[in-house]
From Swiss-Prot:
Keyword set, alphabetical order: Ribosome biogenesis
InterPro entries for the chain: Brix (IPR007109), Brix_dom_Rbsml_bgen_prot (IPR023548)
GO biological process, one term: rRNA processing
GO MF annotation terms: rRNA binding
PROSITE patterns: BRIX (PS50833)
Top-level taxon of origin: Archaea
Keyword Iron-sulfur attributed: no
Brix domain mapped to chain residues: 1-157
This protein's name: Probable Brix domain-containing ribosomal biogenesis protein
Length: 157
């Protein structure tokens, strides 16, 4: 899987692209002037996420299949914890927890293991957890919130 930016990304969008790629064990590229066909060639038949912007800040994630078809998008505002600067991402795949349409869409896209919310505390200390609700997505590492998306909108295509 690949995480990439919009065509002329801000520094904040590049930072989010890197964070998402490390959290999901994916590759990250700054797209630059790369068109959609070049991007599809670069993904080598894998799915990809495009980090879009709103007023110079990351504000939308567009989830595409291996043929470039837009599957769904999430509009959001983001918040980062102070822990993120010193956090070392372990070499493990995250697990998902949560219910609802957004959780279902993310599970089908990422294919990460899904756990019940009451089992999250039983996971190993170095686990990465994507806790998905109707209004926010919390990206947690080692039991602490690293960054969050406040969801502004969700659309399936």
């Amino acid at each position: 899987m690949l995480v990439t930016t919009s065509r002329k990304p801000s520094a904040k969008s590049r930072t989010l692209c890197k964070l998402l790629s490390r959290f999901t064990a994916s590759r990250c590229i700054s797209r630059g002037k790369m068109g959609m066909q070049e991007l599809l060639d670069f993904t080598e038949g894998n799915t990809f996420i495009v980090v879009g912007e709103y007023h110079g800040n990351p504000g939308e994630l567009s989830f595409h299949d291996n043929e470039g078809k837009l599957l769904f998008s999430i509009r959001f505002s983001d918040r980062y914890s102070e822990e993120i600067d010193s956090y070392w991402f372990p070499d493990v795949l995250p697990v998902l927890t949560g219910e609802g349409e957004i959780a279902e869409a993310l599970e089908s896209f990422f294919h990460f293991e899904r756990v019940e919310s009451d089992r999250v505390v039983q996971l190993p200390q170095n686990s990465l957890v994507m806790a998905i609700g109707d209004k926010e997505i919390d990206f947690m590492g080692s039991g602490k919130s690293l960054f969050k998306f406040n969801i502004k909108g969700f659309k399936k295509y």
